[in-house]
């Protein structure tokens, strides 16, 4: 074993993470999404520890936005995926693409229905994990 951390693609359900904190996000969804996207940028290249893997490195960040947040722009290190329909379906499609390419997706969502639709190879954490990582 080389000791190198596993590489992960962080896939964030932006609406779900925003909704996990009662900070007034509902008054300005686009503004709240923009702030969250900016907070994600420093996680590119960050090392994290997961029970399933041990040490892992976030090598890519994908953030799925929908509805009023679809018009937002993200920082360079965050790929913003604008859902044509519902965000959950976009997350499932992206996660399937990643696993088919041999990548390990780490999906951030508390949505139980979405969790059931994700491929078996996807790792899943809740918004609390991400909020703690971001110091929120």
Per-range role (PLM):
Residues 8-13:
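Short, hydrophobic/glycine-enriched beta-strand segments
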Residues 3-4, 17-136:
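Nuclease catalytic cores that cleave nucleic-acid phosphodiester bonds
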